[in-house]
Amino acid sequence: MNVIEGVVATPDARVAIAIARFNHFINDSLLEGAIDALKRIGQVKDENITVVWVPGAYELPLTVRALTKSAKNGGYDAVIALGTVIRGGTAHFEFVAGECSSGLSSVAMDSEIPVAFGVLTTESIEQAIERAGTKAGNKGAEAALTALEMINVLKAIK
């Protein structure tokens, strides 16, 4: 039986992180977690990490698409999308969260480059804070580890 599993240690990986500025007080923690995981666990060199700030989560799919096109030309091995969408009193949450998730998935499928989903979609600020490095771990770090593992899984498949 042949089993393919990815490892997270990927010292030569080139990784881009697209991060939303909206809700930055939460996203900053996601970014810290992602960078820490890339460098400490994945052994990715600092010069191989690029951070791109965008206004909000809705802008992430377009930005990630541009970064994956760069990847096809020798740019990035994976892209991590980070952001936070918190439910409010209007339908805005559904539109932003849904389009962001759908758009990022579409980019990953079209580009065949790992796109790690580190966008929090929560009911409250408290839930977001818990997922950005307190009670529920750091979803930015989890997204970074997912990106690294997927780089290696896809290399092994090809």
From Swiss-Prot:
From the UniProt record, give one GO term of the biological process aspect.
riboflavin biosynthetic process
Q: Where are the transmembrane segments?
A: none
Q: Where is the active site?
A: 92
Swiss-Prot/TrEMBL keywords? Riboflavin biosynthesis, Transferase
Q: What class of enzyme is it?
A: transferase
EC number(s): the record gives 2.5.1.78
Kindly state which reaction or reactions the protein catalyses: (2S)-2-hydroxy-3-oxobutyl phosphate + 5-amino-6-(D-ribitylamino)uracil = 6,7-dimethyl-8-(1-D-ribityl)lumazine + phosphate + 2 H2O + H(+)
User: Residues that bind (2S)-2-hydroxy-3-oxobutyl phosphate, according to the entry?
Assistant: 89-90, 131
Give, as in the UniProt entry, the pathway in which the protein acts: Cofactor biosynthesis; riboflavin biosynthesis; riboflavin from 2-hydroxy-3-oxobutyl phosphate and 5-amino-6-(D-ribitylamino)uracil: step 1/2
- The UniProt annotation places 5-amino-6-(D-ribitylamino)uracil binding at 22, 57-59, 84-86, 117
Which InterPro entries does the record cross-reference, listed alphabetically?
LS, LS/RS, LS/RS_sf
The record's listing under SUPFAM superfamilies reads: Lumazine synthase
Q: Which GO terms describe its cellular component?
A: cytosol; riboflavin synthase complex
Q: Which GO terms describe its molecular function?
A: 6,7-dimethyl-8-ribityllumazine synthase activity
How is the subunit organization of this protein annotated in UniProt? Forms an icosahedral capsid composed of 60 subunits, arranged as a dodecamer of pentamers.
Q: Which HAMAP family match?
A: Lumazine_synth (MF_00178)
Quote the function comment for this protein: Catalyzes the formation of 6,7-dimethyl-8-ribityllumazine by condensation of 5-amino-6-(D-ribitylamino)uracil with 3,4-dihydroxy-2-butanone 4-phosphate. This is the penultimate step in the biosynthesis of riboflavin.
* Similarity field: Belongs to the DMRL synthase family.
What is this protein's name?
Answer: 6,7-dimethyl-8-ribityllumazine synthase
- Gene label: ribH
